Amino acid sequence: MRLDKFLCETTDLTRSLAKKALHRGEVSVDGEVTKNPAVHVGEDSAVDWLGERLTPFGLRYLMMNKPLGVECTTRAGRYQTVLELIDLPKVERLHSVGRLDVDTTGLVLLTDDGQWSHRVTSPRTQRPKVYLATLAEPLQGDALTSAIATFAEGMLLDGEQKPTRPARLEALSPERFRITVTDGKYHQVRRMFAAIGNRIETLHRESIGPLVLDPDLEPGECRMLRGEEIAAF
């Protein structure tokens, strides 16, 4: 890798700022100051900028407890984005692995590993995603029995060509439910409850496949995934 590119990969320097840093003699490779941006940096090269050793950070994998009112998009818009909550270099390279809408909280995965992201979200895997929902109206008795059966059979939502895959509906109280789905249609859980004449007040994602949101993460906090968590997908 070229030295100027390596500087951009491991710092917040742009290509032009990296070349200026080189010109000022701020960078050394294997103990020798170099001003040549085309110098090759190998795996064993020791690169220092202003006396600080630079190391490539490689691929990154995070989980976040997404708060209310935050978007999973990486582009600045009306709402704050998940990337604005992350204090890492080159944060713009991260992307959300499956999104939550701005009104939904809970588990969001982020990475700069496109292949891993595809393994997590591929429809072929049918990975279960578990949500907690609070409803606007109580759901109980015969209406609950009917809803459980309807969710389990699959539903043809407005605007869709195929019905949803079988989903599990578990009542925690007349207004609070745990829902497990294995597909990822747009606003699917909200639309499923709307189809049976109810409305979701709050929606929170607990898990994706085997990965459960860390209970120690406060809304807006994130942490790196452990090796076994990454390998689970």
Predicted region positions:
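Basic, flexible Lys/Arg- and Gly-enriched helix-loop patches that mediate nucleic-acid binding at interfaces
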Residues: 1-233
